[in-house]
Amino acid sequence: MFALILFVSLACANEVAFKQWAATHNKVFANRAEYLYRFAVFLDNKKFVEANANTELNVFADMTHEEFIQTHLGMTYEVPETTSNVKAAVKAAPESVDWRSIMNPAKDQGQCGSCWTFCTTAVLEGRVNKDLGKLYSFSEQQLVDCDASDNGCEGGHPSNSLKFIQENNGLGLESDYPYKAVAGTCKKVKNVATVTGSRRVTDGSETGLQTIIAENGPVAVGMDASRPSFQLYKKGTIYSDTKCRSRMMNHCVTAVGYGSNSNGKYWIIRNSWGTSWGDAGYFLLARDSNNMCGIGRDSNYPTGVKLI
């Protein structure tokens, strides 16, 4: 009898926790069947969080890991062991850098594999503000619809999209070409800014990445974001997972700085999963930790920008 009472009490407590979580994250379920399914997924993720430090029941706690991977990444390729691509110039860099103050709030790619567009607009927005003192919000949807060198919601790469912006004579504003999270027909809008050149560095040097960020501003970087621990990342912690791969890139994010605290050295990185995930859309990643998640393997940034 006691065991039955305990079971019922735990079940009730779990459902209360789920309802509180759903209210916090404005979750609405289509019907009772979906509610029960998401509740079951939530309980599975709750067990994972209870067994793994530095994780939490965040906005993605009602998604299976398979669903998460299918809908929230957007770069899939392997960095070879050797590469002929250019290396970063390694110079003495400041102890810490933080470009968050020149950036827009983190955006949300939704259930579309368009991370490559968000890291591209982020580095363009950051560089324009850094060099020209103007903060714009550029159109990710224009890249999804118009950049034929990439694959819209099926993935892409910032090296391609930065070249597209240069060859297309710029990119328009988000307000003129708003984000839909689905691929559509390319539309013509007024372009506002362009890149005059871009660079891709794949040498794997974290010290080199520090120099790039310090000198050039925010950098679009590839990483392995496929671990369950990253899906359920706990804000304020320095992310580290020994099973995170250093050469298999599947997500593009924006490195905006680096620093250290009592828990270790870290990179400051802006994601494209909205402001409800992480720390207002940002996360800290272990730095000088054998290229954690491949952070230094694929860096992309504009070498110059101009207004049109």
From Swiss-Prot:
Coiled coil regions in record: none
Disulfide-bond pairs as recorded: 112-153, 146-186
Main location: cytoplasm
UniProt organism field: Entamoeba histolytica (strain ATCC 30459 / HM-1:IMSS / ABRM)
Presence of the UniProt keyword Transmembrane helix in the record: no
Family: Belongs to the peptidase C1 family.
Protein localization: Cytoplasm; Cytoplasmic vesicle, Phagosome
Pfam families according to UniProt: Inhibitor_I29 (PF08246), Peptidase_C1 (PF00112)
Gene Ontology terms describing biological process: immune response; positive regulation of apoptotic signaling pathway; proteolysis involved in protein catabolic process
Official protein name in the record: Cysteine proteinase 3
Main function: Cysteine protease which may be involved in pathogenicity.
GO molecular function: cysteine-type endopeptidase activity
Positions of the propeptide removed during maturation: 14-92
Entry keyword set: Cytoplasm, Cytoplasmic vesicle, Disulfide bond, Hydrolase, Protease, Signal, Thiol protease, Zymogen
Residues spanning the signal sequence: 1-13
